[in-house]
Amino acid sequence: MLTVQELVDDNADNIPFNWIAGHGAADRAIPDDGMAAADLVGHLNLIHPSRVQVFGQEELAYYTRFDLRRRMHHMDELLIGGVPAILLADGLSAPQDLIDQCDQHQVPLLSTPVAAAQLIDLLRIYLGKKLAPTTTVHGVFLDVLGLGVLITGESGLGKSELALELISRGHGLVADDAVEFSRTAPNMIEGHCPQLLQNLLEVRGLGLLDIRTIFGETSVRRKMRLKLIVHLVRATAQDKFERLPLQDITQDMLGLPVRKVMLQVAAGRNLAVLVEAAVRNTILKLRGIDTLGEFMERQAMAILQSSK
């Protein structure tokens, strides 16, 4: 649950707020209810009273042109609708009746010198990230050739060793062991590392390694977009993998399908090279190049020509 006070504190660097009224309602919650960030804050709108209401110059001019009785009526509609906070943009001064109403009903009233349109944009970006669906996944998250790659698999398969090999080849570490993912946009999942584990990689026999100190600043990343999941599995006689799968394998992550590659762990296999190859192939597919599809077309043409 996000409160008005948290919103003010988290945006103190970009949006300087000044409390005008409703100081006792700092813990007032901003309702989420699964709504998009665009629906949680916007210009004054009586049809959507339950969002953070922003008064710009036009909205304040609209409000002040009415008599006191009409203003009270509009404020009652907002209050009944459960308005979480009222923000005055552009450094505007609040009318005394608005201050009195907010104090009486304990609704936070704040002002800021930031322009109304910019204020709404900043808060929508903030709310979109703050209230995004999140999950924590066990694995290692890396930047491989500019692509966010999550390495998963059961314990003891060498995920951290593989990550260390990739880092030594010039790729970057985002998070190890516990990776926090959030769906920050309808078609985008971002992954980052918890503050406690930043820059750290745990390798059996070596313990904790500070990757940033060992390999330098360019060896770590703050966050990446998830594009590929590489799942490591033990190589057993019972496993039967399709050598040429006709359909891409995907895994659901926060409601989005993410491309997935299965790699068998066996003696003599260079997994780092295989991961790089999988990433390069994924990049080609994102560009619309389907190697298997082109091969099947070539094969079909060869069969057609040989049958003539």
From Swiss-Prot:
- Asked if the Swiss-Prot or TrEMBL record annotates the protein with the keyword Magnesium, the reply is yes
Q: Could you tell me the EC number(s) of this protein?
A: 2.7.11.-, 2.7.4.-
Q: Looking at the record, which segments are called Important for the catalytic mechanism of both phosphorylation and dephosphorylation?
A: 201-210
Record field: catalytic activity = [HPr protein]-L-serine + ATP = [HPr protein]-O-phospho-L-serine + ADP + H(+); [HPr protein]-O-phospho-L-serine + phosphate + H(+) = [HPr protein]-L-serine + diphosphate
Where Mg(2+) binds, per the record, is at: 160, 202
Q: Which GO terms describe its biological process?
A: regulation of carbohydrate metabolic process
Give the family per the record: Belongs to the HPrK/P family.
| PANTHER family assigned | HPR KINASE_PHOSPHORYLASE (PTHR30305:SF1), PROTEIN YJDM-RELATED (PTHR30305)
Q: What is this protein called?
A: HPr kinase/phosphorylase
User: What organism does the record attribute this protein to?
Assistant: Bordetella avium (strain 197N)
